[in-house]
Design a protein with these regions (language model features):
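Short beta-strand/loop motif that positions the catalytic acidic residue
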Residues: 74, 80-82, 86
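Short, surface-exposed alpha-helical segments at coil->helix boundaries
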Residues: 5, 39-40, 91-95
């Protein structure tokens, strides 16, 4: 939690650094090196976002406390999926969420970080497809 709070404090001071650091948390260094157009596209999207609004959303992420009673009301089959190397929304957090949501399945994407749906699209999509095929 302390890391996330420190990150939030740093984001308030330096918009450029916060975007670059976000992308380094979201993608592996190898992916960034090999996929400059994707990196630049997402960087451009972040650049267009209001920094003030970004900070509001991140503040909510930093200080919000989940209400397990509300989460326990979810009864729909649910896939909780994250990259195994996600440092922001850690796999432990997702696994704990899957323990609270009845009828949920927890999966990690090997070598993935926060945007594993982009970086590891094939395995991510296979995992989602298998979940849908087994639960619909």
């Amino acid at each position: 939690k302390r890391q996330v709070i420190n990150r939030f404090e740093m984001m308030k001071k330096d918009k450029e650094v916060s975007k670059k650091r976000a992308l380094s948390r979201w993608f592996t260094d190898d992916f960034i090196k090999k996929n400059k157009p994707i990196y630049e596209k997402i960087y451009s999207m972040l650049d267009k976002n209001s920094h003030e609004n970004w900070l509001k959303v991140y503040k909510l992420f930093v200080y919000h406390e989940d209400n397990d009673m509300n989460i326990k009301q979810i009864k729909t089959n649910s896939l909780i999926i994250t990259g195994e190397n996600d440092v922001g929304s850690k796999p432990e957090m997702s696994e704990n969420l899957s323990k609270v949501i009845k009828n949920s399945v927890f999966k990690t994407v090997k070598n993935g970080k926060h945007l594993c749906n982009i970086e590891c699209a094939e395995i991510f999509n296979i995992t989602v497809r298998e979940f849908i095929d087994n639960n619909v």
